[in-house]
């Protein structure tokens, strides 16, 4: 079967299977998700063994540590993925919600009802957890889903998808509500992007190359995001006794994810404190890429750092590397963010209410924080149970995408044999 015929088969199966989900009641959907969790537990060792094959192949091919960490599943990570399903089960089902009800002058009653989008296509790279997260959120909202993971995680994704499909069959539902493209041929990606007869929305979760490909090639609405060039501005009125923990958390906790800190902007009045912070960061293995002014302050304290270029500040590091730039004031910090930010997450540390208000008003990213780490931009942290992606665009969805982002609405009008 050629690529086009294969994709058409997937699309047709997803569309027809999705009708079985669309009006499924919340109890039935939650029972299904409970069965997904049970099937994943039953296949626990099988899934880890499949992931071990992916990790071994990745290391043998010379894949970097950051990418290997992204595709790695261990006991704790897999248990966490399964536990997150219970969180989604506990969430209110948005499907069927009626809102914006109104009675028109002609006697017709109108309202909007929340309904599934239909079929969602998700293209992602080296994160096997996405296979489960996306499938669970799609099923909870009555959507069918076509998944295309990276070739680096093919064995893991096959094992995870098989468990999910067993759960669907066990509940008497079509297995094709969740389908995984098991062929690494990149032509299937561009083909999926043009499957507008069957697929209602595409969500790419990957780097700039994937985002650009989807934006340029898709004939289906695309939710762009997941690229995080995240900033934290240390204001002149920040409490430095508490600031270090936030900065270290933002950079170090999990440096390979999109909400990790990429650039620290430090007010020039706090420059004397930079060497203290730098030592604490370097103890955690962080490499500093610093502007000329901060480089001088670090060198005077005997601390090594690499000189930053303009390109450095436009880089999503996805590693234990941190850009550092000294700014004259809050407005220079805001201007820097406007120029370099991907629109993901930014933060300010300050005890000055006027500065905080100014920053929160002027910085227009998907998530803006006062005295908090950028690491909070996450569906689980926001109370969504899990997330489809973090959208950095402004239409349909913005920020972490939970259940509601996988829905649309239709207008319902009730008349009395009404004519216009």
From Swiss-Prot:
One Pfam short name: Aldedh
SUPFAM superfamilies in UniProt: ALDH-like (SSF53720)
Catalytic activities: L-glutamate 5-semialdehyde + phosphate + NADP(+) = L-glutamyl 5-phosphate + NADPH + H(+)
Involved pathway(s): Amino-acid biosynthesis; L-proline biosynthesis; L-glutamate 5-semialdehyde from L-glutamate: step 2/2
Biological processes, Gene Ontology terms: L-proline biosynthetic process
UniProt KW Repressor keyword: no
Cellular compartments per GO CC: cytoplasm
Keywords attached to this entry: Amino-acid biosynthesis, Cytoplasm, NADP, Oxidoreductase, Proline biosynthesis
Xref: PANTHER family: DELTA-1-PYRROLINE-5-CARBOXYLATE SYNTHASE (PTHR11063:SF8), GLUTAMATE SEMIALDEHYDE DEHYDROGENASE (PTHR11063)
Family: Belongs to the gamma-glutamyl phosphate reductase family.
HAMAP family the record matches: ProA
Protein name: Gamma-glutamyl phosphate reductase
Taxonomic classification: Bacteria, Pseudomonadati, Pseudomonadota, Gammaproteobacteria, Alteromonadales
């Amino acid at each position: 079967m050629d690529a086009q015929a294969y994709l058409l088969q997937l699309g047709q199966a997803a569309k027809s299977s999705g009708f079985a989900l669309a009006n499924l009641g919340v109890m039935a959907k939650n029972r299904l998700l409970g069965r997904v969790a049970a099937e994943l537990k039953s296949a626990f060792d099988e899934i880890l063994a499949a992931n071990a094959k992916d990790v071994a192949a990745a290391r043998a091919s010379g894949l970097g540590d950051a990418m290997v960490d992204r595709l790695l599943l261990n006991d704790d990570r897999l248990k966490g993925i399964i536990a997150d399903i219970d969180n989604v089960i506990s969430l209110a089902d948005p499907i069927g919600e009626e809102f914006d009800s109104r009675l028109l002058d002609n006697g017709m009653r109108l309202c909007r009802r929340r309904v599934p989008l239909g079929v969602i296509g998700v293209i992602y790279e080296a994160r096997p957890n996405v296979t489960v997260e996306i499938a669970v959120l799609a099923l909870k909202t009555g959507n069918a889903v076509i998944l295309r993971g990276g070739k680096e995680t093919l064995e893991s994704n096959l094992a995870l998808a098989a468990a999910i499909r067993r759960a669907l069959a066990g509940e008497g539902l079509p297995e094709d509500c969740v389908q995984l493209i098991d062929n690494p041929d990149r032509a299937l990606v561009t083909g999926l992007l043009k499957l507008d007869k069957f697929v209602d929305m595409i969500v790419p979760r990957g780097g700039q190359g994937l985002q650009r490909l989807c934006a340029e090639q898709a004939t289906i609405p695309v939710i762009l995001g997941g690229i995080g060039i995240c900033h934290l501005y240390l204001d002149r009125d920040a409490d430095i006794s508490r600031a270090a923990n936030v900065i270290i958390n933002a950079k170090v906790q999990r440096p390979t994810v999109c909400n990790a800190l990429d650039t620290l902007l430090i007010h020039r009045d706090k420059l004397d404190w930079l060497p203290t912070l730098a030592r604490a960061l370097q103890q955690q293995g962080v490499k500093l890429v610093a502007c000329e002014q901060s480089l001088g302050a670090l060198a005077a304290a005997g601390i090594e750092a690499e000189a930053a270029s303009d390109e450095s500040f436009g880089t999503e590091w996805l590693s234990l590397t941190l850009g550092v730039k000294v700014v004259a004031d809050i407005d220079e910090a805001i201007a820097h963010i406007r120029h370099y930010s991907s629109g993901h997450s930014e933060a300010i540390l300050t005890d000055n209410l006027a500065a905080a208000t100014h920053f929160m008003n002027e910085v227009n990213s998907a998530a803006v924080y006062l005295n908090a780490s950028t690491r909070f931009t996450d569906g689980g942290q926001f109370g969504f149970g899990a997330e489809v992606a973090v959208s950095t665009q402004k239409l349909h969805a913005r920020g972490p995408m939970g259940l509601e982002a996988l829905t649309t609405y239709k207008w319902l009008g009730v008349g009395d044999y009404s004519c216009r």
